UniProtKB/Swiss-Prot annotation:
F(1)F(0) ATP synthase produces ATP from ADP in the presence of a proton or sodium gradient. F-type ATPases consist of two structural domains, F(1) containing the extramembraneous catalytic core and F(0) containing the membrane proton channel, linked together by a central stalk and a peripheral stalk. During catalysis, ATP synthesis in the catalytic domain of F(1) is coupled via a rotary mechanism of the central stalk subunits to proton translocation. Component of the F(0) channel, it forms part of the peripheral stalk, linking F(1) to F(0). The keyword Transmembrane helix applies. One of its GO terms (molecular function) is proton-transporting ATP synthase activity, rotational mechanism. This is ATP synthase subunit b, chloroplastic. It comes from Staurastrum punctulatum (Green alga).
């Protein structure tokens, strides 16, 4: 029986169901019904839509603020990096200039030391030459003296005879006597 009742109810409602549907023709639809539906949607959906839009707006603004903060941080880091780069360039230039100056100082010191060594060597050479000259002069004088004495002895020995010898002795004795009388 249940199934018959169900059939009767459903067959009675079938006619009603055939008349239910959407009318897509805008001219045949009731504008009041549409206005009511839209009004209900606006009234009840306004809060939800406003909340969703506000949440979306806050999310976008938060994202923009975060992006701006990261942008500012990136700019600060970039400026710091540029400052450090400029400092590094300045330090490198200072090191280069100091290196060039140090190299120039060392070059001048080496030149000065080489000049001093050259002067010292020149003085040593001149002293050595003068010493060698003096030594040669002394040796030549000694040799000349020896040769002169030898030659003089040869001449004296060749000319010396008893008569000359006696005359020289007499001459020197006379000189001695003259010195003795002038001293008295």
């Amino acid at each position: 029986m249940n199934s018959e009742t169900y059939w009767i109810i459903s067959s009675n409602n079938w006619d009603l169901a055939e008349s239910f549907g959407f009318n897509t023709n805008i001219l045949e639809t009731n504008l009041i019904n549409l206005a009511v539906v839209i009004g209900v949607l606006v009234y009840f959906g306004k809060g939800v839509l406003t909340t969703i839009l506000n949440n979306r707006k806050e999310t976008i603004l938060s994202t923009i603020r975060d992006a701006e903060e990261r942008y500012q941080e990136a700019i600060e880091k970039l400026n710091q990096a540029r400052t450090q780069l400029e400092q590094a360039k300045a330090k490198a230039e200072e090191i280069r200039v100091n290196g060039v100056l140090q190299m120039e100082r060392e070059k001048q010191e080496l030149i000065k030391a080489a000049d001093e060594d050259s002067k010292r060597l020149e003085e040593t050479k001149n002293l050595t030459i003068r010493f060698a000259e003096q030594k040669a002069i002394v040796q030549i004088r000694q040799q000349i003296s020896r040769l002169t004495v030898k030659r003089a002895l040869e001449i004296i020995n060749s000319r010396l005879n008893l008569d000359l010898h006696a005359r020289m002795i007499d001459y020197h004795i006379g000189l001695f006597k003259a010195m003795k009388t002038s001293a008295e």
